[in-house]
């Protein structure tokens, strides 16, 4: 009804690199649809300890968006490009393992083995710790593809940090879920 009365907008997939027609238009998938997820979530406290140890040392995060990246449409997010307002420490980036990060996170790497990660040379998997500075907002954006699911596991969740909006649905962040 909210859509009928103009209170909510219809959001459709608009991937920037590849669109596969006919896939369902779903904002969120439910956790119970993935039998491997509970095993991964159970390791959240240990993954948090690994992440906190990383955060307590020298800076190992780099800008999540950088101007040297060839991904389409990054320019519209210029307020978070080439700075650490939104940053990442990649375990895997475009299928390449970063041993300087992964050797600090053996439990995280073990937990990721429970997930059905795709291995495509030069493309996947991609797995990372993402860090957003207080007060910074990630602008609305579209993913690269509609043929994969991106899973977020909140490991450190500050009080009143908001939620994840997909289309016209928002879900609050909950540590470990």
Predicted features and spans:
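Fe(II)/2-oxoglutarate oxygenase catalytic core
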Residues: 1-128, 132-145, 160-161
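Generic detector of bulky aromatic hydrophobic side chains
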Residues: 86, 174-177
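Structured core elements
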Residues: 128, 152-154
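A short beta-strand-loop-beta hairpin characteristic of the jelly-roll/cupin
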Residues: 155-175
